[in-house]
């Protein structure tokens, strides 16, 4: 392809080769479906800067947009392990116990955890993992989804069926806040109570989140009604918005995102994209946590300051950040979805916003 040769391309391929264009341009509400079948990934070796390479590509007049592949970062700082595994003040703060009197979620509701990986052996997580019984581990892609043996989730960072954490256990802590088994006489409780979770590892062996937005798509394609993103960075991209559009408009998911920990009134992505539920961080006395981002992009806030959750090796530790606040809300979203099954993802998010104090 001439436009690709102009920048010394060594690889050009469809990002999502199994995707097809939507049958209709919009949904019943008039919202435009995202067409991910048109997205290509390109690698080049020339000495051109990324800005000049993009300019040359756009001169072809056949591209809608061209942009770098932004790699976000996780959004927390961990503390030391605690001896008291029941120290979960956030449940009282958000009135989780009262909510559970009305609805305790259901195993049919699945929360996608796009993060650094899972601990499938943790006794407070193991039973709440969403299992794919259509693709048991036998070396075959039994369900034909393009992912062989994705029985317990998927590792997009390493492209294998083991989403266990490697260098950063951030995802283990996040998973417990939304999805730790409740009412099992062990450890703490996830806000989603009976809701399941799907581990989607988006980090490579070094902990770099190289497949963050691809993780959102994977979760949306594999039955998750709620998708948690406890990561992000500064830099908007059309690709990122396209993925959010796909998850929320095409697939009717709710995407819940950490607002960031820079104590600024400014954009942080994916939290600042359209159709996302952005979550800020509050303290044990229900005030803004010092590092939490704030401003127009924040939709709701939840406790995320020294909150206790699961950690590898059957441990529980406290950690802080909007990374912790986000899964608290994601679990609550699962409860709302189960209480109002006809709601699409955006409606679940609106319900959370209008009922927050």
Regions found by a protein language model. Give the residues of each.
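Hydrolase catalytic cores
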Residues: 177-178, 198-205, 225-229, 304-357
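Active-site glycine-centered loops adjacent to acidic/histidine catalytic or metal-binding residues
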Residues: 115, 260, 321
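C-terminal subdomain of the subtilisin-like protease fold in secreted/lumenal serine endopeptidases
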Residues: 211-243, 253, 265-269, 275-278, ...
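Catalytic-core environment of secreted peptidases
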Residues: 189, 281-324
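Subtilisin-like serine protease catalytic core
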Residues: 97-209, 272-276, 285-287, 293-297, ...
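Structural recognition of the beta-strand scaffold that forms the well-ordered cores
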Residues: 11-14, 40-43, 65-67, 110-114, ...
